[in-house]
């Protein structure tokens, strides 16, 4: 059975995880048959080992790990591969596939560029920056 493990950095503020939880929830709606876990490198729980163990416990024999990072930072290049190797050693009958950072995917780059343009073209700016009482709409492209 296939499983999906989303792996994010983690933060002290619990609200930081909101977008990642929303992604996991959206994926579960789109693929209700797919066991999905969300794990964090640091500062939040569950960690990668715990989340992978939960997927294995429900019968997953193939687990795809998607680093939810914008780029291949030091964490993705330096910290994640040894963690995945430890999963492989702990669960030798499970195939763990580590993908590239999600932010390096062309579809994510296009989506973020589009969202950025949506943000900057929907803002009303003052016609005269020294007199903010005179707003003007930016042209839509």
Question: What do these predicted regions represent?
Answer:
Residues 1-141:
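Active-site-proximal alpha-helix that buttresses catalytic centers in soluble enzyme cores
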